[in-house]
Amino acid sequence: MKEQTASRMSAALFEYTAKPPVGEIIPLGLQHVVAAIVGVVTPAILVANICELGAADKTILVQVSLVVSALATLLQLYKIGPIGSSLPVIIGISFAYVPTLLSIGGQFGIATILGAQITGGIAAFVVGLFVKQLRALFPSVVTGTVIFTIGLSLYPTAVRYMAGGAGSDSFGSWQNWLVALITFGVVVFCNYFTKGFTKLASILLGMVVGYVLALAMGMVSFDSARDANWFQLIMPLHFGIKFEISAIISMVIMFVVNAVQAIGDFSSTTLGGMDRQPTDKELSGGIMASGIVSVVSAFFGGLPTATYSQNVGIVTVNRVVNRLVFAFAALVLLVAGFIPKFAAVLTTIPQCVIGGATISVFAMITMTGIRMITSEPLTPRNTAVVGLAVALGVGVTSVQGSLGGFPVWVGTVFGSSSVVIATLVAILLNLILPRNKTEA
């Protein structure tokens, strides 16, 4: 396949450090921007809404998300000492953290999210140092269970947004559902009935159609965009930083799990684009870089990042691994991050449009978890690990007040996010349940 693709593009595109023509770098880089842009800004909008941030602060949070994603990508491409993977990846704000971010943000606010993120980033850095030793705790059955639970926990968020967003005066109206379902329909059509650019940009195109429809129905206000500046530097500690032990525990658990999960994304990149497994040095450097970025970005309001699987998929298909292509994509995101007017326009997207577009993303997260789970035989032991972890994780958090007799911090850590309970139960059961001879 590589030879066929190379016949249409210069050979330099398939070498990491080569210098292909600018005319080839730009369209391939923009392809990665299109694939990543929705994932970069949507978590920031979700967090801004749950934290009840004003229009100006919401714009800043989106700005920072763009800048952090760009800088995190550049650090992976151009490593500093042992920090960075030197692999062709795009890094962006991660949906995997969203359930925990919404839980912490709804209870404590944005400053506590950022404080917990600092400790989580430190934990991820430590995981990077000892990645070989810690991998044994996270086989596919455990990691798959965690990802599956993340997807499940995000469905209520998507449905609330499809209905118009909690607290909205028009919550549940037919107008919200009409826009949401049309957005959803366009995403599905583009993803499964088209090829090339429209398939790649299915979520973006769905949001564009939904946005235009919402605009025609008078559901969009440009007040925040009208007042936004054309250029603005990002100032540190704008949102402040607070430390809350229960939030820290939840975030550290999520950072450790996602640090180990990053191994899969790095492996997919090297296998799909370079026909090899990643080295231990690449894995360690990549995870440590993610940890450092999370710590530093927290001081500016940036949210946790991860490797984008959709961009890994592009690498697997076209096998273009030249870092200048990815650096160009990062620079586009970086420039966009310093233009508040652009970020402000993104914040005007109605919640029903976001819900209609993201429910398919959350479904894909869930199915990724199922694929990981089924990559190992579904023995009675493995089904017990998955079933019991999901049952306790989803069950406890679905019953309000189920931990009401415990100290407040217990309810905050274990009663607000199904992912935390599912993660701990899956790890514990995987360690203590006996294996038969075929599983040993």
Write out the residue ranges for each language-model feature.
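Juxtamembrane interface elements at the cytosolic ends of transmembrane helices
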Residues: K2-S10, V40-A44, A48, T183-F193, ...
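Hydrophobic, membrane-embedded alpha-helices of multi-pass small-molecule transporters
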Residues: G23-A36, G172-F184, S202, M217, ...
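Generic transmembrane alpha-helix signature in multi-pass membrane proteins
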Residues: A44-A48, V98-G106, K132, P156-A163, ...
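Membrane-embedded alpha-helical modules
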Residues: I104-D223, A330, V335-A440
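N-terminal signal-anchor module of multipass membrane proteins
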Residues: M1-V89, A96-I104
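Membrane-embedded helical hairpins/re-entrant loop segments and their flanking transmembrane helices
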Residues: V22, A48-G84, V252-R323
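Intrinsically disordered, low-complexity non-transmembrane regions of multi-pass membrane transporters
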Residues: M1-L28, F222-M235, L271-P278, G286, ...
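Short, non-helical or kinked segments that cap or interrupt transmembrane helices
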Residues: I60-L61, P82-F95, A136-T145, K199-L205, ...
